[in-house]
Amino acid sequence: MTVTRVVDTSCRLGEGPVWHPDEKRLYWVDIESGRLHRYDPETGAHDCPVETSVIAGVTIQRDGSLLAFMDRGRVGRVVDGDRRESARIVDSPTRFNDVIADPAGRVFCGTMPSDTAGGRLFRLDTDGTVTTVETGVGIPNGMGFTRDRERFYFTETEARTVYRYAYDEETGAVSARERFVESPETPGLPDGMTVDSAGHIWSARWEGGCVVEYDADGTELGRFDVPTEKVTSVAFGGPDLDSLYVTTAGGDGDGSAGEGDESTGDAAGALFRLDVAATGRPEFRSDVRLG
């Protein structure tokens, strides 16, 4: 396994990587700096088409545009790199965190806890209606689906747990929650995640400096070191979905990571690529109508 620092972004809180197959580019966000980043691995070009107050995650719509999940329950569209109209879909004093589209075009989206209430997990349906899935969540984080589309994964960071639910693709309902992976002894806290073409789970470890691979039964298969501690999320990308991109946090948000020895943490906030013996699956696309 090799690890390469591909973009020196110095994100304060890099998160939410997603591969856009139409554009052949990777998108991710710096939540606290309010920047939407994109990277073209063929040319090496990197830019930030959107800068706003807060942007917590994006999904790719079926028409190729993006849904951008922000703060105070707001969701907007990004078309050709320009942020368009936004709508408030939930009443929340906090920001969104991780988001994921499901096979039918819905979006599961978590909000951070406030001083008076825990975080929540919502399901945004294609017609714009919203259903509360979970309440009282510490920090809602990475999500995914099994290969057969019959199970849904949801990470609760403070509980150090990845949960697994029965999932109904027709209705979007989830039920029968069970603990899939508990990791009290694994370095760091479980953060973002993805599911590969073999059904294995790749879990980023906040303050653990690594990505952990599990098989479909929850057995740990390996740990892959990243040269900075705050590893936030992962996504497979590239034309063949054979590169594992890793977002990180802890930079100063000025857009360029440190140039020193990576082992000292100077690479905090950069985007990395891990060359692992695995391939991903195309991300499901959202198909949500706002407003």
Swiss-Prot record:
Pfam families from the UniProt entry: SGL
Keyword Manganese included in the entry's annotation: yes
Disrupted gene: phenotype observed: Deletion mutant shows restricted growth on L-arabinose but grows on D-xylose as the wild type.
Keyword entries, A-Z: Arabinose catabolism, Carbohydrate metabolism, Cobalt, Hydrolase, Magnesium, Manganese, Metal-binding, Plasmid, Xylose metabolism
EC number(s) from the headed UniProt entry: 3.1.1.15, 3.1.1.68
Record's cofactor remark: Binds 1 divalent metal cation per subunit. Most active with Co(2+), Mg(2+) or Mn(2+). Has weaker activity with Fe(2+), Ni(2+) or Zn(2+).
Catalytic residues identified in the record: 191
InterPro entries membership: 6-blade_b-propeller_TolB-like, SGL, SMP-30
Residues annotated as binding a divalent metal cation: 15, 141, 191
Protein's GO biological process: arabinose catabolic process; D-xylose metabolic process; L-ascorbic acid biosynthetic process
Pathway: Carbohydrate degradation
Binding partners and assembly: Monomer.
Task of the protein: Pentonolactonase involved in D-arabinose and D-xylose catabolism. Catalyzes the hydrolysis of both L-arabino-gamma-lactone and D-xylono-gamma-lactone to the corresponding acids. Can also hydrolyze D-galactono-gamma-lactone and D-glucono-delta-lactone.
Family to which this protein belongs: Belongs to the SMP-30/CGR1 family.
Protein name: Pentonolactonase XacC
Primary gene name: xacC
